[in-house]
Amino acid sequence: MTHKYAPLLLILGITSATAASTTYNVDPDHTHPSFEVDHFGGVSIWRGTFKKTSGIVQIDTAAKTGTVDVVIDTATIDFAHDKLNEHVSSPEMLDVAKYPTAEYKGKFVEFVDASPKTISGDLTLHGVTKPVTLTINSFKCFQNPMLKKQVCGADASGTFNRADFGVNYGQQYGFKQDVLLRIQVEGIKVTAASP
């Protein structure tokens, strides 16, 4: 026999499941996407970072689901080398005037207990979107005593081929095209009182 309250219970169940998802605003002061790139086919490794990032993370540890959306200001690239910053920002490489942002959007696809371990998503860089999988190397949430809010932090990493995004400068000189991307991120829980 069909229960007359079944539709209501279903709606309440969906609402409850949705409410279990927690939203975090990416903290730009504690989020530092960084990367490693090859120089002349193994002679050395150049490391850089991006200084400005924004985004939102939603996670439901009980349901083991969640999403990530991180936007990077490509004009803030920093190798601690002014001339190199200028060159990488130029039309010959990232062309930050034409493509001022890079974005990673993905979903948590693997959890161990309550901790996410893998993100399957898409990276948009230089106007090109390609799939990139990130491994979450560490994840922790705590009640920040200064902010008086819950903060979650993670270190995620993955590799991609920059030539796939149309950024293949140096390939003719033997530069390897693989890039190691690391995203060190902290997110502040959004509450009713949050701005």
Predicted regions, residues:
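Low-complexity, acidic/polar, glycine-enriched regions of mature
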Residues: 19-195
